[in-house]
Amino acid sequence: MSTTAVGNNEGTELISSSEQELEHIQNFHGKYPKQLWYLFFSEMWERFCFYGMRGMLTFFMVHQLFMKEDEANLQYGATQAFVYAFTFIGGLFADKILGFRKSLFWGGLLMITGSLILAFDPREFFFLGISFTVIGTGFFKPNISTMVGALYKKDDTRRDAGFSLFYSGINIGALLGGYACISIGKGELFGGTVPENLRWNVAFGLAAVVMTISLITFVFTKRSLGPIGLSPLKDPLTPGVTGEKTKGKKWMMYATYIGSLAVVPVIMTMVAKTEYTDWFMYIIGPVTLIYLIYEMTKYSAVEVKKLTAALVFIVFSIIFWAFFEQSGGSLSLFAANNLDNKLLGTLEVDPNGVNNAANSLFVIIFAPLLGLIWIWMSKRKIEPNTVVKFGLGFLFLSLAFYIFYYTRYFANMQGMTSLDFFTLAYLVVTFGELCLSPIGLSIMTKLSPKALQGVMMGMWFLASAYGQYAAGILGAGMVSPNESASAAEKLIAYTDGYKQLSIYALVAGVVLIAISPLVRKLMQEVK
């Protein structure tokens, strides 16, 4: 009896201490908490690794693995779909077992392993390396975003600005990795230094180096996070957790680690054969939705309405990413086949590097500015609500794809068109993305109960998985059926597809803005 009482007293003191520590973190002064900067740099280097490899995939598959263009588009969509689908699984294990910190660290180790395998022999071990990266990203990505959300109280108006800054960190990494990795692989960067037969090895090896920097950054700054991200088996702020309850639970953590390694051969097989991806995507979505509905039964009607609103955002984000992610598929091949290498008439650059990096550069420039604009508008009570912001994102995307389509009118007889207009389209894409993606990360944390935040963040990225999957299908449909088609014929095929996407994006934006009053009611007090 006395032992239990002492244990309860110790638990109460621990909870009180953790609550005070969290309160201190959330009551920061200024625009951003210092912990945001630590997570910013860790995420920046991880995104260098991720986007560096993402930018190489389609080009590498066509020119090094000698896949057909439509096959490479489908393969790209399948690979990226698995990457984002596993963010849901990673969020689930983080919520229930590992906690955000351990999940992030384990994911980082797996990503480093995958990059090193690809650096050793990217042609022979392509799918093995990609499989490690798929699983690693699933454990890493949703959890660092959730920890950013935990730095803020639910009603803190600075949250959107914080996520916008964090998003610019993502894009600094994407800019550097997106341009550097593929340019090294193609020999456009350090071509005179790196031997031709080792260029792709070095490109993938660079991804491993920067991922290691990301992990080291997190390890040396994680203490500043206080109770944020601790395992739910140990976190004193988790309801029902006591010292007695956590005893003997370590096997669950070890089982998670071992299980994630055991599924590598399964993932390798499924990623290599896109028909398996089809079945996976047919199953994972309905199963995830059923699981969420089950979890929703545990909450009040008010919380259920908020989660329903979150699902509306998730559905429309699938459509958005299906269009946006042409950047890694059809637009990558369009850049390789149909763009000149002159920017602003004088600068000679790699068109694929521009395709991978232009959007990120524009986000770096405009994300902080847009965050400040949202704050300025909020203070004057003229800020558009979150649903309208989403709708505006689609309208910008529609305009961008019309510009991609319009590049056909600047092409020469050989089918080579203007890199300047292509880059202009990415500027417009950026405004669309900034209306949706950083706000989307923020709204998931605002609409979700604490116990479901990891799962809902995972669902947000699962929506990206379906978007990536659809992007591969859309990109494959744009490819000319004649593999020996000229550059001019490929130009017509791709730009016809971009015109269709422009129309679809316009319709989606108008519909979303039209239903915004209904969605706002579901969101309750959340803005």
Name the predicted role of every residue range:
Residues 1-34, 154, 182-332, 336-343, ...:
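Intracellular loop-helix junctions on the cytosolic face of multi-pass helical membrane proteins
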Residues 44, 114, 125-140, 314, ...:
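Hydrophobic core of transmembrane alpha-helices in multi-pass small-molecule transporters
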Residues 53-73, 186, 327-353:
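Short amphipathic helix-loop junctions that connect adjacent transmembrane helices
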Residues 77-94, 141, 175-177, 357-372:
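Central cavity-lining transmembrane alpha-helices of secondary-active solute carriers
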Residues 83, 158-186, 203-214, 258-261, ...:
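Glycine-rich segments within core transmembrane alpha-helices of 12-TM secondary carriers
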Residues 87-123:
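Conserved MFS/SLC helix-loop-helix module at the cytosolic interface between two early adjacent transmembrane helices
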Residues 96-108, 303, 376-395:
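Cytoplasmic membrane-interface "Motif A"-like loop-to-helix N-cap segments
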Residues 109-127, 391-414:
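C-terminal ends and interior cores of transmembrane alpha-helices
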